[in-house]
């Protein structure tokens, strides 16, 4: 009996420990590295993720035990690829599994360099990003750092070249950004690609040790230094052409353009931008959700089984934003409601009313099956979509007006015809033909 109690106690303690560990574990993140030394050279970036609660698993990109999916389930929530020159991933990871991971809603952060391998190039093509050739680099003869060795590949990117989206790049002004790596261009037919950081008008991508004999792959503002993607399923991917961008040396380095009269900054803006990008790509920022949705006739509190045409209705929706791990009310002034039956019959702005958004409007004089639809798609935020289906019926016979003012001419014409027929009948019945004389 005592042994049975002891066994039950041990099992209970084990389940309790598993439950506690599951509650404490943060987002599971797999980090694929070029070599193990990256944990030291990029320690500030990884430490910031750990401090924010991420459960990091460090492995080399060619580790034979690598796996993203097991028994149809994703083993990780996020994927970091800091292995630019990898030619083949280890284990069962390949471009197909990474694409499936993105299709399943996973978040991916990719850092490349001039030594870029085919797998990252192929992954970029899947996401609408085209990397330049191996051994090429972004070159700018006007905006390079004072410590550049002479090839003008240590680029100083101004914060004015950042995407105007505080949710993605942060709200605070940034110092100039150091960049050394490969250039990218976006697929013009892919509207989901985000130009997060572009080169200046004097930048281009080419082989730094060769003379220019052909038109460069990327020129001017078309040269992407950092690009992003938010898929239609709200999965997020960020591509950086520079692995050094996330390094401790670039985080702590002073920065100054080589041009005379340029200002010197004690630190770059790399750390702040890297933190903002990681918070966005790993869905700590810019995540919206729909809370309670309600609708009813004005003056009532519950929805009817069916509305009647021309009813005055009130629609309310609660929209929340993820902030510091907590859901808080979202503040927006451009949220619209559509009342749709194939096409919108009503489109109006929702007004914030306390902790919810609401609006009152009159239903159209059209019956059928309609939807209250909120389709909110803004730069940097997850796609918010909410639909509620209702029925709108015509007026019942007892609900019509006894006399319709607009029908008075028809009433008059009907009664005039009746009156004329009555007079004609009297005249016709009492009319007597004159007798003919012999």
Swiss-Prot record:
GO biological process: one example: protein N-linked glycosylation via asparagine
Membrane protein topology class: Single-pass type I membrane protein
Signal peptide start and end residues: 1-25
Residue numbers on the Cytoplasmic membrane side: 430-438
Coarse class of the protein's main subcellular location: endoplasmic reticulum
GO cellular component: oligosaccharyltransferase complex
Pathway terms, separated by semicolons: Protein modification; protein glycosylation
Keyword Lipoprotein carried by entry: no
Residue ranges, Lumenal side: 26-408
Subcellular localization: Endoplasmic reticulum membrane
Coiled coil: none
Record-stated family: Belongs to the DDOST 48 kDa subunit family.
UniProt subunit comment: Component of the oligosaccharyltransferase (OST) complex.
Function: Subunit of the oligosaccharyl transferase (OST) complex that catalyzes the initial transfer of a defined glycan (Glc(3)Man(9)GlcNAc(2) in eukaryotes) from the lipid carrier dolichol-pyrophosphate to an asparagine residue within an Asn-X-Ser/Thr consensus motif in nascent polypeptide chains, the first step in protein N-glycosylation. N-glycosylation occurs cotranslationally and the complex associates with the Sec61 complex at the channel-forming translocon complex that mediates protein translocation across the endoplasmic reticulum (ER). All subunits are required for a maximal enzyme activity.
Protein name (database record): Dolichyl-diphosphooligosaccharide--protein glycosyltransferase 48 kDa subunit
Native source organism of the sequence: Xenopus laevis (African clawed frog)
Name of the coding gene: ddost
């Amino acid at each position: 009996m005592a042994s049975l109690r002891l066994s039950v106690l041990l099992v209970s303690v084990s389940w309790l420990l598993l439950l506690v560990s599951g509650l404490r574990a943060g987002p599971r993140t797999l980090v694929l590295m070029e070599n193990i030394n990256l944990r030291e050279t990029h320690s500030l970036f990884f430490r910031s993720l750990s401090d924010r609660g991420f459960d990091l698993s460090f492995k080399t990109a060619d580790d034979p035990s690598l796996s993203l999916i097991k028994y149809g389930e994703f083993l990780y929530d996020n994927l970091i690829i800091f292995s630019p020159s990898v030619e083949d991933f280890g284990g069962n990871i390949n471009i197909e599994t990474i694409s499936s991971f993105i299709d399943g809603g996973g978040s991916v952060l990719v850092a490349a360099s001039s030594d870029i391998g085919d797998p990252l190039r192929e992954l970029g093509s899947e996401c609408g990003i085209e990397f330049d050739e191996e051994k090429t680099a972004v070159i700018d003869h006007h905006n390079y750092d004072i410590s550049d060795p002479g090839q003008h590949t240590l680029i100083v990117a101004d914060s004015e070249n950042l995407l105007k989206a505080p949710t993605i790049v942060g709200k605070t002004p940034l110092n100039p950004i150091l960049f050394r790596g490969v250039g990218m261009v976006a697929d013009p037919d892919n509207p989901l690609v985000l130009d997060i950081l572009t080169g200046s008008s004097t930048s281009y991508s080419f082989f730094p040790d060769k003379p220019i004999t052909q038109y460069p792959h990327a020129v001017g503002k078309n040269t992407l230094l950092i690009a992003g993607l938010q898929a239609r399923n709200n999965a997020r991917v960020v591509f950086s052409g520079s692995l050094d961008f996330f390094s401790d040396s670039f985080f702590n380095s002073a920065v100054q353009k080589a041009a005379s009269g340029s200002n010197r900054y004690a630190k770059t803006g790399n750390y702040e931008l890297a933190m903002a990008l990681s918070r966005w790509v790993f869905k700590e920022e810019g995540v919206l959700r729909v809370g309670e949705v309600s609708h009813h006739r004005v003056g009532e509190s519950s929805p009817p089984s069916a509305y009647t045409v021309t009813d005055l209705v009130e629609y309310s929706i609660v929209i929340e934003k993820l902030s510091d791990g907590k859901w808080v009310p979202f503040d927006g002034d451009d949220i619209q409601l559509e009342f749709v039956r194939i096409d919108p019959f009503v489109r109006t702005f929702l007004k914030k009313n306390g902790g919810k958004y609401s609006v009152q409007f009159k239903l159209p004089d059209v019956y059928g099956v309609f939807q209250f639809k909120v389709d909110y798609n803004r730069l940097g935020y997850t796609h918010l979509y909410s639909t509620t289906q209702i029925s709108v019926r015509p007026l019942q016979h007892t609900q019509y007006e006894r006399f319709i003012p607009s029908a008075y001419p028809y009433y008059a014409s009907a009664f005039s015809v009746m009156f004329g027929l009555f007079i004609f009948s009297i005249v016709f019945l009492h009319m007597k033909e004159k007798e003919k004389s012999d």
